[in-house]
């Protein structure tokens, strides 16, 4: 299959997001699509797969003009899109999620459970994963849910597969399994559109790379004929002098301390963070890092242990109590737990600090709007009108809104779980700079990240977890990838 997208433009009201795009996609090729959040990558692929129409332009498939009125039509034609944010129903089982809208029935009109199970297990086998079919999908980790999204696409007869940040929540082993599947699909003649911000993946897996910026295509090249510096410069329109900005904050006394904390999937976790310090938490998926942070914030119940702020023990049994104590928590799954997508930017940003803008029982609209606009300007949130629905923002800008929400409470401690997941290189640097500014003000920061270069580049100290326990601590000077991975896998 050959796809030619010609002169594609798209506007939402007065906001032009794509302008005169020409793009060719070919079966049997892996084609990377790169660009900052808001560059138009996902919008372009949504037009291809029928989620919404182009304002102008034409799509040719094997020389014939064709458009799809919805994604299901595109899937039936052999074009599938795995979105960055997972399209799952938490209460339904894995099997029900896999076959939702594509149920297989017997000649009597009943669900063919046997055949659906067989096909599901075949898809999992190709991915190299083992996931129970009869448990609610909401009980699974983000990484496992992502693998199920990928497995869905394998249930169809594929010609073109679009993947938007498919490895964002995957372990190294799951990523290697995914690459194996991608290479296998390529050998079968399937074309892959691979949207990613991860340079190492682009150079490892793709044949061609197209860079987008501000709704236009900047360049298309064979991947082997370019390099990461060139791609970054084309993506952001400027040279990034240092990927991780230099940190100048003075580290003060201990401000936040956790002692012998035990929960459902971890035990005896102890650590401390000083004023102005960024403490990184590393480990493999399933090591228990997120569970520790959720327990500290009162989302999950603790079994035992103590939490102190400024040497005073505090009791937290709910997120509202955590917020009152001055703890901010950016969760790893922003759309389910960090944002209300139907609310506008202002309402999302002021959710935890509503009382701060209330006088005599009345909400001070003027003061809150001014405050929110300052945050929008400071965080460079694109299309950032306070009244704009958060669901209309790109992933990177949504992440900035969540960050702004917690900055608004003037936190005594800030916990960030995968703060740059699915965020482009330019927005990542802006988030790092913001973290440094908060540290300069003395805010202690705990950062959970599966991005090892990020852990090494941003953290003052690093705690490593393995199978629910702290397996080691490393200073910034002594830490390197080998030492972190050794501790993450249970070594000493």
From Swiss-Prot:
Keywords linked to the UniProt accession: ATP-binding, Cell membrane, Membrane, Nucleotide-binding, Repeat, Sugar transport, Translocase, Transport
Cellular component, GO, one term: plasma membrane
Top enzyme class: translocase
Pfam families, per database record: ABC_tran (PF00005)
Keyword DNA damage: no
Residue ranges occupied by any ABC transporter domain in the UniProt entry: 3-239, 238-492
EC number: 7.5.2.7
Record's subcellular location: Cell membrane
InterPro entries xref list: AAA+_ATPase (IPR003593), ABC_carbohydrate_import_ATPase (IPR050107), ABC_transporter-like_ATP-bd (IPR003439), ABC_transporter-like_CS (IPR017871), P-loop_NTPase (IPR027417)
PROSITE patterns: ABC_TRANSPORTER_1, ABC_TRANSPORTER_2, RBSA
Superkingdom of source: Bacteria
SUPFAM superfamilies the record matches: P-loop containing nucleoside triphosphate hydrolases (SSF52540)
Coiled-coil region list: none
One function term, GO molecular function aspect: ATP hydrolysis activity
Keyword Translocase found: yes
Reactions listed under catalytic activity: D-ribose(out) + ATP + H2O = D-ribose(in) + ADP + phosphate + H(+)
Residues reported in the UniProt entry to bind ATP: 35-42
Subunit description: The complex is composed of an ATP-binding protein (RbsA), two transmembrane proteins (RbsC) and a solute-binding protein (RbsB).
Function of the molecule: Part of the ABC transporter complex RbsABC involved in ribose import. Responsible for energy coupling to the transport system.
Protein family (similarity comment): Belongs to the ABC transporter superfamily. Ribose importer (TC 3.A.1.2.1) family.
UniProt name for this protein: Ribose import ATP-binding protein RbsA
Organism of origin: Streptococcus agalactiae serotype Ia (strain ATCC 27591 / A909 / CDC SS700)
